[in-house]
Amino acid sequence: LLLTQPILPLADIRNADEAALRAQGWRLHQSGTGEALFELLIRMVGRDGQLISPSVFVPLAERVGMMPKIDLWVIGRALRFLSTLPANSRVGLTVNLSNATLQDSESLKLISGMIEGSGVLTSRLIFEVTETSEIGSLHSARKFMQSLRKLGVRFALDDFGTGFSSISHLKHLPVDFVKIEGSLITDLTESSRDRTMVASMVSLAHALDLKVIAEHVDSMHTLRWLADCGADSAQGHFLGEPVRLEEIDFRALNVAAVGVS
């Protein structure tokens, strides 16, 4: 099952009404002038019909070597969806790539072929690296990412601020975005140490010409602090619950459409 969750530009939503954000934050993209990003979230459905979190099934899939196949399936779905959008659409999708896929040369060939054959504007596709495990060989990962960047694909370093997504990865990996790890965002209102750390991360990322996405935003106070701090975008249940991809009228997001930079 594929769900999607909005990643909202802070410039568009910092003065928004809290009730509107809680109701359907993604609709605020309609009045925005920038890129409208959505993260694709994969969920398994159990025999009882309940959704199973990636924290449960991803480690199992990694152990049995299934993650490259799962990643390829999700990428295929993303490309098919993007191919249905108008040429002037502002919508971009972010898709998680597993460590196993980053180390697999055959996956690189298959993904490159899928992208080249899709006919989509490749900058609309953003791969997030490092969700649940440490990036294995930085050399292999960098080579993988550089090959896809030549096709126009962009990359985000996920969970930045954890032991796995470290500052050294900004030196070695060709990324365009950093996503600040959610536990640092969740405690912003109580922890001056976390506020200092997040502010430093934002400054570092911008000095490297990277955009900053804050994850797990759960209050209006946190949202406005992040906007004042200079973070570029925010994501979290406060801004929009994950919904099925087909439930969102993405064509409505072509209002005041601009090209994806």
Predicted regions and their residues:
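Catalytic-core regions built around general acid/base machinery
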Residues: 111-114, 143-151
